[in-house]
Amino acid sequence: MSIRLLCCVAFSLLWAGPVTAGITQAPTSQILAAGRSMTLRCTQDMRHNAMYWYRQDLGLGLRLIHYSNTAGTTGKGEVPDGYSVSRANTDDFPLTLASAVPSQTSVYFCASSD
């Protein structure tokens, strides 16, 4: 790939403009020492009733951690141990790791649906 082509691609991305995400996770990446706690935030602006937290480990498909069918209610998924959630309102569904362990190293996904 020539330098000129690479510059054009970068320039095109700069002019792409903002995109409405609908659902946002934060932080986007995190390195955490064993034994430390942290909260992954998930926010959606689509007024969906249901929200979900999944994890994907190397070589495996998505596995459900916790879910919420409506604000004020939560349920456990396939791999809930070591995690807690809350759902005080329709828009937010934070996932907390109380005391991180190496087996929780994963890619985490938040989702929502009607």
Swiss-Prot record:
Disulfide bonds join C42-C110. Keywords: Adaptive immunity, Cell membrane, Disulfide bond, Immunity, Immunoglobulin domain, Membrane, Receptor, Signal, T cell receptor. PROSITE patterns: IG_LIKE. Residues 22-114 form the Ig-like domain. GO terms for cellular component: plasma membrane; T cell receptor complex. Residues 1-21 form the signal peptide. It is found in: Cell membrane. One of its GO terms (biological process) is cell surface receptor signaling pathway. InterPro entries: Ig-like_dom, Ig-like_dom_sf, Ig-like_fold, Ig_V-set, TCR_beta_variable. SMART domains: IGv. The keyword Disulfide bond applies. It comes from the Eukaryota. PANTHER family: T CELL RECEPTOR BETA VARIABLE 6-2-RELATED (PTHR23268:SF19), T-CELL RECEPTOR BETA CHAIN (PTHR23268). Alpha-beta TR is a heterodimer composed of an alpha and beta chain; disulfide-linked. The alpha-beta TR is associated with the transmembrane signaling CD3 coreceptor proteins to form the TR-CD3 (TcR or TCR). The assembly of alpha-beta TR heterodimers with CD3 occurs in the endoplasmic reticulum where a single alpha-beta TR heterodimer associates with one CD3D-CD3E heterodimer, one CD3G-CD3E heterodimer and one CD247 homodimer forming a stable octameric structure. CD3D-CD3E and CD3G-CD3E heterodimers preferentially associate with TR alpha and TR beta chains, respectively. V region of the variable domain of T cell receptor (TR) beta chain that participates in the antigen recognition. Alpha-beta T cell receptors are antigen specific receptors which are essential to the immune response and are present on the cell surface of T lymphocytes. Recognize peptide-major histocompatibility (MH) (pMH) complexes that are displayed by antigen presenting cells (APC), a prerequisite for efficient T cell adaptive immunity against pathogens. This is T cell receptor beta variable 6-4. It comes from Homo sapiens.
